[in-house]
Amino acid sequence: MAGLEVLFASAAPAITCRQDALVCFLHWEVVTHGYFGLGVGDQPGPNDKKSELLPAGWNNNKDLYVLRYEYKDGSRKLLVKAITVESSMILNVLEYGSQQVADLTLNLDDYIDAEHLGDFHRTYKNSEELRSRIVSGIITPIHEQWEKANVSSPHREFPPATAREVDPLRIPPHHPHTSRQPPWCDPLGPFVVGGEDLDPFGPRRGGMIVDPLRSGFPRALIDPSSGLPNRLPPGAVPPGARFDPFGPIGTSPPGPNPDHLPPPGYDDMYL
């Protein structure tokens, strides 16, 4: 039990009861498992510092001891509470990260000789049993639960993105057009209006000009270069441009006769 006697000697002036001696032993056992004491109380304080010694004010309350510890690599932090209940002491340990809890109840008379608190060699009884109970009841359960929590949620690593995913300006590889299907137009498709606007580099399809006389069969297309009073000069309307004709439709079939199905009484001059 190397180190326990030195720790007891440093804390001897403050050890005045059985529970003080037991908390001193508990502190030593926690430190031997790679932890450092930080301070007292539930919350961090301005005077916190890593130390193997008991912090100042560790036994101000003989009924409730509250100590905080941190593992040597900073991966784990413990909150240890020791509660005195008549001749017993209840030990409760919380690991902050995983929120795992372990507790242990010890009979003070089984391990502490209250008549010889000033003599280290006579203060503790059944030291090996006490140490075994602390390790099996607190240290081991906390470590096992912490390791299990880390294994159940491992850190996932994703492979780096390829150049094609991260470079939006990358030029795609060139493929010969030997197997490309020749473009063709579908004169019977009644719902291809605007298709060429959506895919300007694809095969020639319907533009934004809708032929109201289209009934599923090829007909004479509306001349998009029609203007007033004559046709627009060649090249005024680029191929595939968004352009509405603003003049007569020229050679296309005429519109409906305004005298066809006239309204009743249209020729009555007295109406």
From Swiss-Prot:
Residues 251-265 have a biased composition (Pro residues). It comes from the Eukaryota. The modification Omega-N-methylarginine is found at residues 205, 231. GO terms for cellular component: cytosol; endoplasmic reticulum; membrane; perinuclear region of cytoplasm; proteasome core complex. Residues 222-271 are annotated as: Disordered. It holds the Pfam family PI31_Prot_C. The modification N-acetylalanine is found at residue 2. It is found in: Cytoplasm; Endoplasmic reticulum. The modification Phosphoserine is found at residues 153, 252. Keywords: Acetylation, Cytoplasm, Endoplasmic reticulum, Methylation, Phosphoprotein, Proteasome. Residues 2-150 are annotated as: Important for homodimerization and interaction with FBXO7. Gene3D superfamilies: 3.40.1000.30. GO terms for molecular function: endopeptidase inhibitor activity; proteasome binding; protein heterodimerization activity; protein homodimerization activity. InterPro entries: PI31-like, PI31_Prot_C, PI31_Prot_N. Changing residue 6 to R: Abolishes homodimerization. GO terms for biological process: negative regulation of proteasomal protein catabolic process; proteasome-mediated ubiquitin-dependent protein catabolic process; ubiquitin-dependent protein catabolic process. The modification Asymmetric dimethylarginine is found at residue 219. Monomer and homodimer. Interacts with FBXO7. Interacts with the 20S proteasome. Belongs to the proteasome inhibitor PI31 family. Plays an important role in control of proteasome function. Inhibits the hydrolysis of protein and peptide substrates by the 20S proteasome. Also inhibits the activation of the proteasome by the proteasome regulatory proteins PA700 and PA28. This is Proteasome inhibitor PI31 subunit. The gene is PSMF1.
